[in-house]
Amino acid sequence: YVAQSAAASFNPAHRLIEQTTSSTIRFGIKEKAEAHKDAHVLYAALNLPDPTNIGDRYPHQVSGGQLQRVMTAMAMSPRPDLIIFDEPTTALDVTTQVEVLSSMRAIVEEFNTAAIYITHDLAVVAQMADVIKVLRYGEEVEEAATRQMLKSPKQDYTKSLWSVRALQKEEHTATDSIMSLRGIDAAYGTAKVLFDV
């Protein structure tokens, strides 16, 4: 299970490597040395920087995207048949989301693990899922292959979700102005660098 908020899921007093390997060691799946070596493999597969040493850091010493990938490594450590990602990119900026999703997809494929992505983010759904199941109030509304679901949903509720995605933004040309300023002066210390722009 990979939670929505990685920061809230880690103990700040323990190093990342200890937390990544704790369940694997505790349940006798691997000995400590083997579990640590495997964690380094997982860190590398998830494109974490300096995979042999990043585990020596504490949670507050890595970025949110890195922490999300460490949590994925922790969930993948015992090599589960199924992993659940619960809103895995909600707390991340768009650029970091792309990196994290790419890493998650790669590791799930590499280790032949089934994955369930729980999300409200249609971009995540389109990028990650082979099959989409739409729920409303805990009940299934519709299920279909991703391409089919995105192209032609059958149920009204699903159509309403997709229509939000399809709203067209007002188009602008390169010559359209979004702001106009006149008479701007600027100085750097006592030196004027702009005058009446």
PLM regions and their residue ranges:
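A short, surface-exposed alpha-helical micro-motif characterized by mixed small hydrophobic
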Residues: 125-127
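C-terminal boundary and immediately downstream tail of ABC-type ATPase nucleotide-binding domains
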Residues: 49, 151-178
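Short, glycine/charged-rich "phosphate-handling" switch motifs in NTP-dependent
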Residues: 131, 143
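Helical segment within the ABC ATPase nucleotide-binding domain
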Residues: 98-111
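A short, proline-enriched helix->beta-strand linker immediately N-terminal to the Walker B motif
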Residues: 77-81
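Q-loop/switch helix immediately C-terminal to the Walker
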Residues: 5, 12-26
